[in-house]
């Protein structure tokens, strides 16, 4: 998220906007990405990281105190700055920003999706408690978002899923996170997955699919890059499926671009996403992708492309996923056609396409207020 916010702030500053970034837990650390010298960086010194989490009671009491301090300091600073527009990135200030009396237009941008907020479709009908919590999360998000002048979502699919429960929605995609002059040759008999080893990334599903296809394609291999609490479970699953010789788990690497370039197909079996950077990176490097129809991102990236650059299959249909994957494994010409289309599709997410939409939104909101 910091990369996206930095790119947006630098672009707007270049257009002549007066831009401020307000943080809560900076604690003297310099920004990771370079900011335009005209941008004001202000830390409110709330320090949510200091909340005592040793028990639920201490956590909730501490969080309430910190949020009260956050609200007081933020309102004071916004009145001092007298801004035209204030944006919430959807964290602690999301619940109270619209109620601050500083005179600015309030916007919220969601870096998640309906699928992340409303997870009931993953729970069995008999799991009443979790389904009830899911319904409450959906209601709470929609109620809070409706208090903003505009909610910016990452995908058209997400906007359709929320429907009329959210007022004044704009869709602005994430920026392409990388830039490369090179593209993959797609000659290597190698698939790649890049994800945290966490339940929502559903790498167990990736391994199940791989076990199906590697029987008839023993000369192919799968390399998975990431880390997380499910590492040992995934290792055990690989052994149980008998795929250790064709599949490996790797720690995250700073040279991930090189790993994409030496691969031929990206696999994604996530349960939920916002707009996955991994999928955008694959587009830039010319990799065709096979994805489940998770909420959200795969449909906006792959199905809205001018030319097919991958496959999106029904969520959880391992046979359909394996069939599409084998189609790409067998047909080098198809891989390369889709790879070329992916590279062309990448331009939809370039800064010169995405960032002007923010400028247009701000101008529209300010003019409508006058």
Segment roles from a protein language model:
Residues 11, 17-61, 161:
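N-terminal strand-loop element at the rim of the active site
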Residues 85-87, 100-121, 131, 152:
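Active-site proximal beta-strand in glycosyltransferases
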Residues 157, 175:
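Carbohydrate-associated surface elements
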Residues 183-210:
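Conserved donor-binding/catalytic core segment of Leloir-type glycosyltransferases
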Residues 252, 271:
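Aromatic "clamp/platform" in nucleotide-sugar-dependent glycosyltransferases that forms part
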Residues 303-319, 327-332:
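Conserved acidic donor-binding segment of nucleotide-sugar-dependent glycosyltransferases
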């Amino acid at each position: 998220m910091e990369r996206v916010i930095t790119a947006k702030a630098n672009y707007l500053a270049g257009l002549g906007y007066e831009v401020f970034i307000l943080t809560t837990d900076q604690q003297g650390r310099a920004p990771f990405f370079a900011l335009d010298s005209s941008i004001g960086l202000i830390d409110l010194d709330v320090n949510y990281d200091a909340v005592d989490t040793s028990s639920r009671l201490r956590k909730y009491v501490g969080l309430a105190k910190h949020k009260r301090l956050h609200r007081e300091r933020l309102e004071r600073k916004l009145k001092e700055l007298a801004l035209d527009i204030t944006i919430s990135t959807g964290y602690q200030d999301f619940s109270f920003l619209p109620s601050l009396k500083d005179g600015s237009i309030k916007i919220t941008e969601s870096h998640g999706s309906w699928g992340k907020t409303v997870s009931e479709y993953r729970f069995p009908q008999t799991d009443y408690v979790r389904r009830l919590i899911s319904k409450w999360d959906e209601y709470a998000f929609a109620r809070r978002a409706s208090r903003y002048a505009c909610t910016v979502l990452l995908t058209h699919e997400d906007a359709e899923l929320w429907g009329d429960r959210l007022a004044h929605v704009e869709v602005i995609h994430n920026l392409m996170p990388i830039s490369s002059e090179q593209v993959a040759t797609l000659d290597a008999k190698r698939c790649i997955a890049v994800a945290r080893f966490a339940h929502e990334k559903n790498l167990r599903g990736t391994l199940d699919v791989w076990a199906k296809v590697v029987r008839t394609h023993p000369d192919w291999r799968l390399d998975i890059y990431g880390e997380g609490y499910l590492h040992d479970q995934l290792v055990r699953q690989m052994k149980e499926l008998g795929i250790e010789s064709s599949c490996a788990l790797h720690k995250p690497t700073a040279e991930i671009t090189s790993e994409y370039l030496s691969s031929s197909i990206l696999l994604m079996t996530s349960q939920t996403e916002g707009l996955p950077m991994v999928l955008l990176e694959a587009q830039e490097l010319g990799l065709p992708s096979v994805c489940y129809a998770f909420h959200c991102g795969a449909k906006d990236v792959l199905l809205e492309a001018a030319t097919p650059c991958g496959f999106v299959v029904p969520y959880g249909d391992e046979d359909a996923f394996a069939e599409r994957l084998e189609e790409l494994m067998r047909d080098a010409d198809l891989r390369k056609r889709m790879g070329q289309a992916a590279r062309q599709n990448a331009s939809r997410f370039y800064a010169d396409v995405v960032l002007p939409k923010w400028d247009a939104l701000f101008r529209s909101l300010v003019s409508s207020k006058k």
